[in-house]
Amino acid sequence: MRYIVFIITFFFLLNSYSQDTVYARRVIKKLCSKELLGRGYVNDGVNKAATYISKELKTIGLAKFGKSYSQSYSFPVNTFANSMSVIVNGKTLTAGKHYLIDPRAKTVKAEFQLFKKDSLTYEANDGRRPAPLKVKLRKKLTYTVATELSDTTIVELLKDSFPNELKTMDVIFENKFVSNFKCQNLVSYVNGTQQPDSFIVFTAHYDHLGAMGKDAYFPGANDNASGVSVLLNLAKYYKKNPSKYSIAFIFFSGEEAGLLGSRYYSENPIFPLSKIKFLTNLDLLGTGDDGIMVVNATVFKEQFEKLKQINDSKNYVKKIKQRGKAANSDHYWFTQKGVPSFFIYTMGGIQAYHDIYDVEKTLPLTKYIEVCKLLIEFNAKL
């Protein structure tokens, strides 16, 4: 009888939990707002995002390991905070839409004659080697973050916008290299009811690419405001329904700069890594039309089978694909230190990625609730 009551209660809680997509939308919209400028390094966007997440954790009522949720660290990063201009063949281009500046670039204020090297590459040839400017035509513009500088400026142009041969390019922008940008991870938890010294850990990075000049910023709805919203929703669930194990929620910065926040944390853990029973890293959770991918599935086969069995029974997602070990997100450093871990992301749907089009308005959240339910049931079987 007690078992039946437990099952009924468990699924009632899951159904109640499933109603909170409104909260998910609110979180994603805030994280993608112009106020936070892509959660990067212009106007301290990433730390403004940390302040917002910390307030949410406090409102939910999550515990701290110390006086605050914050774990501070720093790293170098290149930024473009001021206005920029790129004119090609006399046509003024729009930042983010028509062009990207290499994130490693130094200040440039010059006009260049362009010479075609091949079908997708042009160079400015003023006698210097290497050439001071390279222009690359791309089918899609995909931005990133740089922690170092380059002597050659690369400008990427959207290929479909330039059917004719390039002749001239007028480029104006300023960089500011910050050698010691202060950033933070956020760490919180819900105490376990039976084995509080053992932890189930959820992680997600909250940083993104920030801004490129004054006219372009990268909202990062799918990458990874979606994952942050899942962690906050799971935090709300476990605060009301504690597990027998403690549940920790870690929000990393510096992921887009090279998994820097998670690396720092893995080398300076707030609680012993040996206490982690399992870690699930979540990123790109805004779609799911084609199911989910589980990185490390071939490493931790027993846990993967548990996850797969749940989905085979409940049909939460179309399919669960498996990959082996990969250094493609914040789970990596934990795997390297012997912590059993998965990295889960959704597949299919929108194609916006590391560009100005990854926005809250078009993020479908196709299998958002189903993935959350799958995670809750998976944790219950660990």
Q: How would you describe each model-predicted region?
A:
Residues 242-243, 252-352:
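Metal-dependent peptidase/peptidase-like ectodomains
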Residues 106-109, 137-219, 236, 244:
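Soluble metallo-hydrolase cores and metallopeptidase-like ectodomains found primarily
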Residues 34-44, 59, 71-74, 174-176, ...:
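Second-shell loop/turn segments in exported
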Residues 1-22:
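Bacterial Sec-dependent N-terminal signal peptides
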